[in-house]
Amino acid sequence: MRALVQRVTSASVRVDGDEVGRITPPAGGHGLLVLVGVTHTDDEAKAALLAKKVWTMRILENEQSASDLDAPVLVASQFTLMADTRRGRRPSWSAAAPRPVAEPLVDEFTGALRELGATVETGVFGEHMEISLVNDGPVTLLIDV
């Protein structure tokens, strides 16, 4: 599994013009926008490990984690994170898991974050989403497990 994690001062996601998720940390605070990609060999253990890593990664103020600050998290699935761009000019999507594999694992990741104590908002799996964010820093990390 792969997560693109961004430290944000706000983030929201819209589907068909309707807002389906939003995080607004307290004034001066941060939250995390997490885009999640799943490959064929991923499983529930990897989803739980990725959730723990994201929740405890020390990328917020004063080298603290989202866990330390109860920072909100917005999660959206993004199969394009699994693109292979090493050859030619057209990305290959063959490493991205199909929906029957990926959707339950994104749900497992989100559930694991909630079990760890996170306040989590989500996008809608498989839908075209418009994501708005204010990336602070910028701080953007790619995490693979």
From Swiss-Prot:
NCBIfam families: D-aminoacyl-tRNA deacylase. An aminoacyl-tRNA editing enzyme that deacylates mischarged D-aminoacyl-tRNAs. Also deacylates mischarged glycyl-tRNA(Ala), protecting cells against glycine mischarging by AlaRS. Acts via tRNA-based rather than protein-based catalysis; rejects L-amino acids rather than detecting D-amino acids in the active site. By recycling D-aminoacyl-tRNA to D-amino acids and free tRNA molecules, this enzyme counteracts the toxicity associated with the formation of D-aminoacyl-tRNA entities in vivo and helps enforce protein L-homochirality. InterPro entries: Daa-tRNA_deacyls_DTD (IPR003732), DTD-like_sf (IPR023509). One of its GO terms (cellular component) is cytoplasm. PANTHER family: D-AMINOACYL-TRNA DEACYLASE 1 (PTHR10472:SF5), D-TYROSYL-TRNA TYR DEACYLASE (PTHR10472). Coiled coil: none annotated. This is D-aminoacyl-tRNA deacylase. The gene is dtd. It is an enzyme of class 3 (hydrolase). GO terms for biological process: D-amino acid catabolic process. One of its GO terms (molecular function) is D-tyrosyl-tRNA(Tyr) deacylase activity. A Gly-cisPro motif from one monomer fits into the active site of the other monomer to allow specific chiral rejection of L-amino acids. Homodimer. Its main location: cytoplasm. It catalyses: glycyl-tRNA(Ala) + H2O = tRNA(Ala) + glycine + H(+); a D-aminoacyl-tRNA + H2O = a tRNA + a D-alpha-amino acid + H(+). A motif (Gly-cisPro motif, important for rejection of L-amino acids) lies at residues 137-138. Its EC number is 3.1.1.96.
